[in-house]
Amino acid sequence: MVSVELIKNRLQGIATHPTTVLAMSKTELQSVKECVGKSKAESTYQNLCYSDKLLCEFVKDKGIKDIPVTIITEDLFEEYRFYLKKQGLAAATINRYLCWLSRLMYRAVSQRLIRCNPFENTKYEKTEQKIRFLQKNDVAKLMALKVNDKEAEQARRMFIFACFTGLAIADMEHLQYGHIQTAADGQKYIRKERQKTRVEFVVPLHPIAEAIIKHCKAEQEKNGGGQSVKEKGKTETRTDNLVFPCDCSRSVMSAKLSIVGKACGIRERLSYHMARHTFGTMSMSAGIPIESIAKMMGHASIASTQIYAQVTDNKISEDMDRLISKYQKEKVKEEAI
């Protein structure tokens, strides 16, 4: 329903905000872009760019240039959902793109273009969240692998580092030696804000992670120093060197990591987020309290950490099922004898 405020503005010739879906999408995207390097990560902006792209393609597919927000009903939500399903996208991915459309409607409400979000009561398809992580023997294979390619070695090294620290790829890219501190008892740890959420995390430095840092430091000193960090939107350059300086893009690093995984005989495609999940599951299996894991991983909510507890419980259940099955087979053999 059109608000009284909008009618008044139109009669007076006032149009302070975009009043169509695609125009609103571009404006919202621009506001996110302006926050990159401050309160938003570059990856967040890139993901939303694709949300905008798909929305544009959907409107174009309908044979129109744009859609006024004032005529939108719940039907459009279902039309867009069906369109995304035809693209062969997974349910979780579809939900993410639908959320962008709903976000635009909430923005229209805040700007008094419409009275309420027409999608407020719509249901999103429930998806079972499955996390991918490596077993200890696969991590050991990666650690034993010898790599001659410089970029592939960097990819391997960062993946192993993430397995023992839980750092996301964005946090490793921005990790400086100044983020590594020493406690009164001599224990070294990483203290840093997450690039994605700005939530501080504190994680003790595992001996393997510490060895990787020492190796990186020695290499950089041998080559005459590393790269320093330039924060987006700032002219000053910080003097602390990056632990993992890299001249290639993240996509190249991901491709190299995939090659490394295949070289180790690991069937699943490796990703840096898989390394983070590996840290979470290994920590939970080691009996570390969930509150401590949440702090180490920089989770804004402990609900994000609870998935690792679920994975560990499932693993225990599977192991027990195998044990029972083995016992039953042995019992059948004994009875047969």
How would you name each of these model-derived features?
Residues 129-132, 138, 174-215, 231:
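Conserved tyrosine-mediated DNA breakage-rejoining catalytic core shared by Y-recombinases
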Residues 195-214, 227-232, 236-259:
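C-terminal catalytic core of Y-nucleophile DNA break-rejoin enzymes
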Residues 219-238, 323-337:
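C-terminal secondary-structure termini that scaffold catalytic or DNA-interacting sites
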Residues 160, 164, 170-171, 256-259, ...:
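C-terminal catalytic core of tyrosine-transesterase DNA break-rejoin enzymes
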Residues 95-97, 114, 119-169, 173:
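Basic, Lys/Arg- and aromatic-enriched nucleic-acid-binding interface segment
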Residues 54-58, 67, 75-78, 86-120, ...:
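N-terminal DNA-binding recognition helix of tyrosine site-specific recombinases/integrases
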Residues 133, 194-198, 297-322:
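Catalytic-site neighborhood detector that most strongly recognizes the C-terminal catalytic loop/helix
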Residues 179-186, 267-268, 288-307, 318, ...:
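Short, polar N-cap/turn motifs at the start of nucleic acid-interacting alpha helices
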